[in-house]
From Swiss-Prot:
It comes from Vibrio campbellii (strain ATCC BAA-1116). PANTHER family: 2-C-METHYL-D-ERYTHRITOL 2,4-CYCLODIPHOSPHATE SYNTHASE, CHLOROPLASTIC (PTHR43181:SF1). Homotrimer. It is an enzyme of class 4 (lyase). Belongs to the IspF family. Pathway: Isoprenoid biosynthesis; isopentenyl diphosphate biosynthesis via DXP pathway; isopentenyl diphosphate from 1-deoxy-D-xylulose 5-phosphate: step 4/6. One of its GO terms (biological process) is terpenoid biosynthetic process. InterPro entries: MECDP_synthase, MECDP_synthase_CS, MECDP_synthase_sf. This is 2-C-methyl-D-erythritol 2,4-cyclodiphosphate synthase. Involved in the biosynthesis of isopentenyl diphosphate (IPP) and dimethylallyl diphosphate (DMAPP), two major building blocks of isoprenoid compounds. Catalyzes the conversion of 4-diphosphocytidyl-2-C-methyl-D-erythritol 2-phosphate (CDP-ME2P) to 2-C-methyl-D-erythritol 2,4-cyclodiphosphate (ME-CPP) with a corresponding release of cytidine 5-monophosphate (CMP).
Length: 158
């Protein structure tokens, strides 16, 4: 049996940098406003995994109303959810992440993001794809007000 999950997340720029995305700290004059570390890529990926196992969303498992998760490392949240995936008898087939941002430039950091995600999801890096695009200066991402990310995962029954 296979399961597909989709995730989406958005965070607004604010405060001091760096931007944490895909498990990588990217130098930038602003950070992202969030209850946790604001890693939109890992939040979307975490939601995709939760969706694939029909387990709700990241806010249900790590609510921003709980101080326990304040400043949380999103890599730890991702690993926790992947443990739940494995407990249900699934393993990752592949993950595909799309980052929508006018700034900062993501291209120099994509390989490091793929490596971090592959490590956290206990898979070969060839099963992880991260790509970035701009919105041609349209919308809130185009105005450099924030970053949006989508993620899709394919899970296989072990």
């Amino acid at each position: 049996m296979i399961r597909i999950g989709h995730g989406f997340d958005v965070h607004k720029f604010g405060g001091e940098g760096p931007v944490i995305i895909g498990g990588v700290a990217i130098p930038y004059e602003q950070g992202l406003i969030a209850h946790s570390d604001g890693d939109v890529a890992l939040h979307a990926l975490t939601d995709a995994l939760l969706g694939a196992i029909a387990a709700g969303d990241i806010g249900r498992h790590f609510p921003d109303t709980d101080d326990k998760w304040k400043g949380a490392d999103s890599r730890e949240l991702l690993k926790d959810v992947y443990r739940r995936v494995k407990e249900q008898g699934y393993r990752l087939g592949n993950a595909d992440v799309t980052i929508m941002a006018q700034a900062p430039k993501m291209a120099p950091h994509i390989d490091a993001m793929c490596a971090a995600i592959a490590e956290d999801l206990e898979t070969d890096i060839s099963n992880i794809n991260v790509k970035a695009t701009t919105t041609e200066r349209l919308g809130f991402t185009g105005r450099k007000e924030g970053i949006a990310t989508e993620a899709v995962v394919l899970l296989f029954k072990q």
